[in-house]
Amino acid sequence: MNLYKIKHPEEQVNFAQAVRQGLGKDQGLFFPETIPALTNIDELLALPLVERSQKILGTLIGEELPKATLDAMVKNAFTFTAPLEKVEDNIYALELFHGPTLAFKDFGGRFMAQALAAVRGDGKITILTATSGDTGAAVAHAFYGLENINVVILYPKGKISPLQEKLFCTLGGNIRTVAINGDFDACQALVKQAFDDAELRQAIGLNSANSINISRLLAQVCYYFEAVAQLPKEKRDNVVVSVPSGNFGNLTAGLIAKTLGLPIKRFIASTNANDTVPRYLESGNWAPKATVATLSNAMDVSRPNNWPRVEELFKRNGWNLSDLGSGMLSDGETEETLKAMYAKGYLCEPHGAIAYQVLKDQLKADETGIFLCTAHPAKFKESVERILSLDLPLPEALDKHNKLPLLSDEMDDDFAQLRAYLLK
């Protein structure tokens, strides 16, 4: 698999190099040089998740990894299901929260851990990543206890749910967590500064586990196929997928699936009040505002890292950006949507609720809608209980960590401090 850097296409790497490096020079994103079209979509959709995913990732990555190695990586990573649940006649929820940390990022985080272990070579590696909630838990649990891999996770202090924080800030060992006095964009900016410091990168073997790492992104492609595979065959012709969007890695993965040949008619990017992309698609003016805190905190991102990959896919495929649907919901609208969904018999959380409502508003009569449920409702226990006036029991995975003490350090939004912390 050959990849190039979107900013500077002359900088090219193979899959192993892209996994090890995470980002290119000058914070450049790596992207596959070619995405081969699959010709046997119906046969693939008839296969179980793991076997189908082995074939999809084998096609994308090519012969760089031995087939037995890649097949084992997929089997070890995808140890849980992604059920498609009917919410109403033509709308389905793809539940991506049945993994060990109850969020969609278990797919990408676990596959990346397998990939890095397979290609890392000698020497220690430091994973540095920023999280607005779910990435931290998925990465921490995927890499916890792996030899010669240290993990440092930055997150905005006071801006993620207490349960999210407990899920990844209680492990210790090779997992260090840092609460930054700033928002998620500040955390991302610190990560990017670290990657631009060549001396630091070399000294600690720096890598990233955000969706900027290609291995995470490729793993996420697989659950879009799983969604369509679970639809009745008569409903596969006009499929519309609504993606709750913050950093836009999830949407990028869906667009790669469409490029491979998965029959998805169109996508909708659904955001909260941090609506840089919906405003851009409407006006043509890229104008990020200051990030605001919302109920759907994992989407509190006003400068999405993966947007260049989205535009690259549209350009390469000859698609028109105006065909990408978008919409946003305020916190008040999100609360009303959660109540309406619960009245229909479906318990959701803020991110999934936004994706559902924007889909419902834009879905046509002859279309089948799928919205992505990216986290278990219990990960947002306080909000969901308050909005729906119910008592939400904690799943075992959350309950266990909820009883443990936080092990986080605290730091100002200051790269010099972070650099010293990483080197010690």
What are these regions (language model features)?
Residues 1-424:
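PLP-dependent amino-acid enzyme catalytic core
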